[in-house]
Amino acid sequence: MPAAFPVTAATPAGAEALDRLRHWPGEHRVAVGLSGGVDSSLTAALLVEAGWEVEGLTLWLMSGKGACCAEGLVDAAGICEQLEIPHHVVDSRDTFQREIVNGLIEGYQAGITPLPCSRCNRAVKFSPMLQWAQEKRGLARIATGHYARLRFDETTGRWRLLRGLDARKDQSYFLYDLTQEVLARVVFPLGELTKPDTRLEAARHGLRTAAKPESQDLCLADHHGSMRAFLDAYLPPRQGEIVLQDGTVVGEHDGIEHFTIGQRKGLGVAWSEPLHVVRLDAAMNRVVVATRDQAGRSHCVVGAINWVSMAPPAPEHSQMVQVQVRYRSAPVPARLTTMTAEASDAAAERPHRCRLDFDEPQFSITPGQAAVFYDGDAVLGGGLIQTSA
């Protein structure tokens, strides 16, 4: 235990977290993904206090300033020094550029609104960190500061991914793409804590990051100052028309990448009633808008599904679920019906598709975003929205 470790008693939430970690099944040796923020810092501190053998692992994702850049590396190194644990840095900038930045730009150019965070978790963070920890340090587990919970279901033999206790900070939406193989080797120490609990516990440990401001949800926006600034750095302005669904021109834009489905504000269009973006036409470089009574969507098709808390169902399986179609949106009821994979999808890594029929029209069904299916707090699965109508 580090000499500078706190002697004051843990908060009730902190004490419960420590008890869970002390009784966690299996080996208590772990690499902690450290971004340099308060959440990952406390994750490492709690594991050390619970008696785990802990090593810090930071992925260097971008050059410049920010949580995933040099600033984050410095704070992460400082935390490891304070906790008296080893700190390792893996240069993942090329992988991040290839898997996330390039894919994001290509998506916006194609007229979709990509969700980089879930792909980053799967392709850049969790699986690569597990591989590095196992191969380089002989560590079978990783831990992160995500607000989500895990439970093993003895009946199904599957790990169930659950919402974090703090509804405002719950990050299960971004974790739907993690496989059972990954979930079996992951620990989420903050899953039962609220953000205020985290701040209090970080202060109790005297962590240098205890009062550090939160970064934006999207690290690229945080890195560039805004999402628009990020897009402007990669995509030159390309003027086009804003049109009604019948083709009537009602305005102009300087790039479809600056718009998303459901958007009402910032269109720069004067009309007799509010207009909403309903489609981005990349081929014609057009933003298609409609009044609210025309903007609702009753169903959508979801592809590249990853089944989490439930095994992949048979084609034409149907059940009611709660669906979340944006990170900050509330879940809504819908009927999920699985579909037979198309010939073009048959060889894909994740060929599963489904149709979602909503109880009431939805106004933010956005191709490229994730639709995540819930049963209560449990993530049943999720995939990427392909089409809507």
UniProtKB/Swiss-Prot annotation:
Residues 169-171, 326-327 are annotated as: Interaction with tRNA. The gene is mnmA. ATP binds at G33, L34, S35, G36, G37, V38, D39, S40, L59, G145. HAMAP family: tRNA_thiouridyl_MnmA (MF_00144). The record marks H146, Q369 as: Interaction with tRNA. This is tRNA-specific 2-thiouridylase MnmA. Belongs to the MnmA/TRMU family. Keywords: ATP-binding, Cytoplasm, Disulfide bond, Nucleotide-binding, RNA-binding, Transferase, tRNA processing, tRNA-binding. GO terms for cellular component: cytoplasm. The active site is at C120 (nucleophile), C219 (cysteine persulfide intermediate). PANTHER family: MITOCHONDRIAL TRNA-SPECIFIC 2-THIOURIDYLASE 1, TRNA 5-METHYLAMINOMETHYL-2-THIOURIDYLATE -METHYLTRANSFERASE. Disulfide bonds join C120-C219. One of its GO terms (biological process) is tRNA wobble position uridine thiolation. Its main location: cytoplasm. Gene3D superfamilies: Adenine nucleotide alpha hydrolases-like domains (2.30.30.280), HUPs (3.40.50.620), Translation factors (2.40.30.10). It comes from the Bacteria. It is found in: Cytoplasm. It catalyses: S-sulfanyl-L-cysteinyl-[protein] + uridine(34) in tRNA + AH2 + ATP = 2-thiouridine(34) in tRNA + L-cysteinyl-[protein] + A + AMP + diphosphate + H(+). Its EC number is 2.8.1.13.
